[in-house]
Amino acid sequence: VGSKVVPMPPNATVVQVGLNDWEIGKNYPADIALHADVGETMKALIPALQRQGGKSLDKIAAGRLSMLSKINWGSRNLKTRELAKENSSVHPIDPDWLMLNVVDALPSNSIVVNESLTSSRALPDLLPFRDRYGFHGNASGGIGWGLPAAIGVQLAHPDRRVLCLSGDGSAMYSIQALWTAAHLNLPITFVITNNRSYRILKQRLLGFHKSDAYVGMDFDEPQIDFAGVARSLGVTADTITEPEAIRPAL
């Protein structure tokens, strides 16, 4: 299994199991590819491996688990929580503290739609991924996808609560989606992280071109009152500026 922390060993034998044919063999060639449910396959495979390898496999597995315990999701989750709490009183609100409050306020069985491009860096290490439909985010493509995508997700899952995270720059591309949410009476919670700029464009310009010529990338003359815009479109809204006010508002 590969991840951002531990790359796939070069000589590993790859057995890939899944129900999405398009995903099988996409990132790594599979020595054995099975179109099957992962959970059901593991139920059948684990007893067979135990019969074949016995205690020798248990010892190898224990060593690997011990190594991974320092870098796995649970470990990163604890560290990220600790770091976020250290910034719990920072002004302006620290993005990691915001994400921690968002995750802890989520009802069970919620779905998160994320287009908060530069403010959600801590989200992967805070949000547990419980099912294939529980998280939607864009890896690339056009800006402004998040707000209308949340509407589509809520319509597809009327029995689940949807939370949409969007940057202010992204929200400006499709802010009219709030009217659609109000018009359809959808119970979506929208959180717009407002840093008054296209921060993602600034980061790319600085990172790729070593330039800080940020032309047309700031929203400060005038500043945008997103809560006021939302209310004008029929959505109940508040502006949160104090770190301790995030959780009660959510």
What is the predicted function of each stretch?
Residues S56-N87, V153, N195, I200-G207:
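Charged, low-complexity, helix-prone segments enriched in Lys/Glu/Asp/Gln
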Residues K70-Q154:
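Active-site diphosphate/adenylate-binding microenvironment
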